[in-house]
Amino acid sequence: MIDDRDTYANRERFPGAKEVIAEDFEAAMAHLSPGESSFVVIVTRGHRDDMRVLRWAVQTPARYVGMIGSKRKTIAIFRELTKEGISAERFKRVHAPVGLDIGAVTPEEIAVAITAELIAHRRHAEREMPHMSWFHSHQGEAETEAEDSPVAKTPENQ
């Protein structure tokens, strides 16, 4: 469990976590080496942090990479990372929005939906889940939709 805030990343809040890291995401990621059996779930507090972590995660051999967020945010982040030179092929394994569609609304329900997807993936129980099929089948359309995204329009890339 990683968070850049001590108030969230601590043993009191996550007593069962194998490891709790409270430092900047990039510094934390520099110490991690996910393997082919690793699961990476990206749930940060902002688009920029999500993008920073996803940039790293898609370049690892992790078995599962999931990211919370809307389709619009995901499309904008994928576009930005593609502009940086990351192959669109790497995004095919990203589950976004993360979690099975169970109509979750509350934080607890969202946690259940995410956990259910992780279990399904671990147990090879995946069926045709639409996680990113909408992105790959409508990539041109999705790029147009993302034009107005706050992630797509920043001072660095305007």
Task: List each language-model region with its residue ranges.
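Adenosine-phosphate binding glycine-rich loop
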Residues: 62, 68-158
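Short amphipathic alpha-helix with an adjacent loop that forms part of the alpha/beta core around
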Residues: 25-36
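Structural motif
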Residues: 38-39, 64
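Rossmann-fold NAD(P) dinucleotide-binding segment
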Residues: 49-62
